[in-house]
Amino acid sequence: MGKITFYEDRGFQGRCYQCSSDCPNLQPYFSRCNSIRVDSGCWMLYERPNYQGHQYFLRRGDYPDYQQWMGFNDSIRSCCLISDTSSHRLRLYEREDQKGLIAELSEDCPCIQDRFRLSEVRSLHVLEGCWVLYEMPNYRGRQYLLRPQEYRRYQDWGAVDAKAGSLRRVVDLY
C-alpha cells in the first residue's frame, strides 16, 4: 500500500490532499501542486488527468518544490501507485518492432550512450518489473513509465522521439 500527500504551496504548506491508490483525476482536490511527501510506495505522477502529459517518478521522500521532482510546472492532475517486484528485466532494440537487439538489462543504467554507444531506442520489451526511461543520462529529462509488455515503437511509451538517456528499475528502497 502506498501513501502520498500533495500540497498546493511549497514547503508542505497550504491545502493538502492525501492519496493511497491510483487517481485518474486530482483536479477536484487541489488547483496546483508545489510540494509532495511520499510516505510509502513508488508513484508516477502525470501533468494532466487520465494519466496523460509529462510523467514524474517519485520514491519515498520529501519534495519541497516541483523542481525537486524535475517538474516543468505546478500541474499534477493524476497519479498511479506502481507495484514493486523483486525481479526486473527488459530488452532494448535499435529498430522498431523489436529488431536489432542491443541488450537485455536487469539493473539500472545511468547512461545508455556510454554503455551501448547509442542515444536512441526505437523499441523495447519489458519482461519483468516496472522501469522508468529518462530521455537524458543520469535520470534527467522527460520520464516514461514502462510496464511489462512489448513496445514496438517509441510512441507506444508516450515519447515524441526515440531519445533515450538512462533507465531505472522501479524499486521501493525502504
UniProtKB/Swiss-Prot annotation:
This protein's UniProt keywords: Eye lens protein, Methylation, Repeat
GO biological processes: lens development in camera-type eye; visual perception
Region (Connecting peptide): 84-87
Alphabetized GO MF terms: structural constituent of eye lens
InterPro entries: Beta/Gamma-Crystallin (IPR050252), Beta/gamma_crystallin (IPR001064), G_crystallin-like (IPR011024)
Signal sequence residues: none
Protein function: Crystallins are the dominant structural components of the vertebrate eye lens.
PANTHER family tied to this protein: BETA/GAMMA CRYSTALLIN (PTHR11818), GAMMA-CRYSTALLIN C (PTHR11818:SF32)
UniProt protein name: Gamma-crystallin C
Organism: Bos taurus
